[in-house]
Amino acid sequence: MDHEIHSFIKRKLKGVGDVWFSYFMMSKNSTSQPYIISNYPEAWMKEYIKKEMFLSDPIIVASLARITPFSWDDNDIVTLRAKNQDVFISSVQHDISSGYTFVLHDHDNNVATLSIANHLEDANFEKCMKNHENDLQMLLVNVHEKVMAYQRAINDQDNPPDNSRNALLSPRETEVLFLVSSGRTYKEVSRILGISEVTVKFHINNSVRKLDVINSRHAITKALELNLFHSPCEPVVMKHMDAR
């Protein structure tokens, strides 16, 4: 997937010339290692990650407080660089000294950036960035959407949903739906379980919502398909019936 996204970014950046780029994504809630897709020199990327430079990188620090694109030569960036020169001094050794960064903050409290380095020292670089600002910002949005979708898919594989009876419906919801499926009225169910008819309807409505159907009949059909009326609920139901 990283290779696909790398190729996607590279293809979309053809219009702005032969540039180095870096997509960076990190949670604002933790200092865990960021997710990076880049064609920066490999030696620089290894040093950047090994020394955890992202924690003090002036570009990332600035991105945390901004929502609009910015040049690395902006006054506030220059000021941040002066306060923390280690990252800049190291990056210059790899021909990364000027560039432009696009910023995105998502609903999961992540910050994502698309940084484009002017490693060829093109005099028209900044003008080119400004001319393509909207397209490049949308590129960041599209890339970030792909990355998050990919990570969600991986997470779903690692943590598959629990489709057991108890994961879908509570024991009481299963009891109520089981009794209704056997042809009993809400009044009869309320008497068997010792609850009010209002509570019976409440549990039925919850079952309909959780099973993502439109009414109780459909809920019963889906519950049967999913084998939710498995034996665990039946002894409980029988206990209530015997107590009548």
Curated annotation (Swiss-Prot):
Residues 162-227 form the HTH luxR-type domain. Keywords: Activator, Antibiotic biosynthesis, DNA-binding, Quorum sensing, Transcription, Transcription regulation. GO terms for molecular function: DNA binding. InterPro entries: Sig_transdc_resp-reg_C-effctor, TF_LuxR_autoind-bd_dom, TF_LuxR_autoind-bd_dom_sf, Tscrpt_reg_LuxR_C, WH-like_DNA-bd_sf. It holds the Pfam family Autoind_bind. The keyword Transferase does not apply. Residues 186-205 bind DNA. It comes from the Bacteria. One of its GO terms (biological process) is regulation of DNA-templated transcription. Belongs to the autoinducer-regulated transcriptional regulatory protein family. Functions as an OHLL responsive transcriptional regulator which acts in the control of the biosynthesis of carbapenem antibiotics. This is Transcriptional activator protein CarR. The gene is carR.
